[in-house]
Amino acid sequence: MKKDIIEFEDIIGRYFNLKINNQNYRIYVEEAGSGIPLICLHTAGSDGRQFRHILNDKKITDKYRVIVFDLPWHGKSNPP
């Protein structure tokens, strides 16, 4: 039997739009898993990629819905 050569990760990435004080923000978020929400906030000058290992950790995503977002001006999120 031929083994699959492509293996997809369970991470889902998408954008959401947020309006605060008449200012529009387009924020990129990735999530994986189900259960108790676990929100990961990246450090200054970085983006959500620093949590890639958590998003791919089955021991964590079996118990938690891991949510990672890029702050405005970081990663895939646009400036306001």
Regions found by a protein language model. Give the residues of each.
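Alpha/beta-hydrolase fold catalytic core
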Residues: 1-38, 61-64
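Gly/Ser-rich "nucleophile elbow"/oxyanion-hole loop immediately N-terminal to the catalytic nucleophile
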Residues: 80
